[in-house]
Amino acid sequence: MNNRVLLKSNSFSIVNLIIIINCVLFIPWVLNYVTHNGALLGLEFMFGALNIGFGDSIPSIDNGFQFGYQLLTSMFLHGNLAHLILNMYALYAFGKPLEKRWGSGHFLAFYLVVGILANIASYLFFSLTGAERVSLIGASGAVYGVLLAFGAYYPEIKVLLFFIIPLKIKWLVPLFAIFELFIEMTGSADGIAHITHLFGFIFAFIYCLIVFRFNPIRRMYFSPLIVDENERYR
């Protein structure tokens, strides 16, 4: 392995930092669960979630751009332990190889831009469809973008779907996309913003086209990247 790859491997990890921030911001949820005092959690969600259609009752991006920060802060909040664990596990598994390949700065830019654009598109979607009292939280939009980019570099890698079924990443990506689209179109009231997941895929695709100058779908299925032996995914 060359010195450049060694430097990237041993240097500061932005993926680890993102995971730490998400876990720290989950502490109010833990305190609420243990003490049954939801005051801190309520404040965190009131100011940190991307709130849509609440009128003037709580801080909301509807009420002015001064609350636009919610497009960012909502990416670091999670509604329950499973939500946090699944997102952070996926971020670690799929994000680490991308950070090693791109470098921390490029990975952070990709993660934040894709996540924020997915939130902006979700805000417009819910606003234009007349949705009321919607609070968006979670890193899923950005994480779905990470999954798409990972698939472009490592399409043949197998993962265990539901920790049971072995499936190549290049088939997992379209399976997730079809599933999210189906759930969104059938109007499932499961409390999950499936449209945000789809926007994560879309903006990751656009980001790869514009910034990295490659088509992730073409690379995934028609012209796979030849991965150097020293850079194989582990």
Task: Identify what each model region corresponds to.
Residues 1-27, 33, 105, 179-234:
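C-terminal transmembrane module of polytopic alpha-helical membrane proteins
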Residues 82-91, 137-148, 190-212:
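Alpha-helical transmembrane segments that form the membrane-embedded catalytic/substrate-binding core
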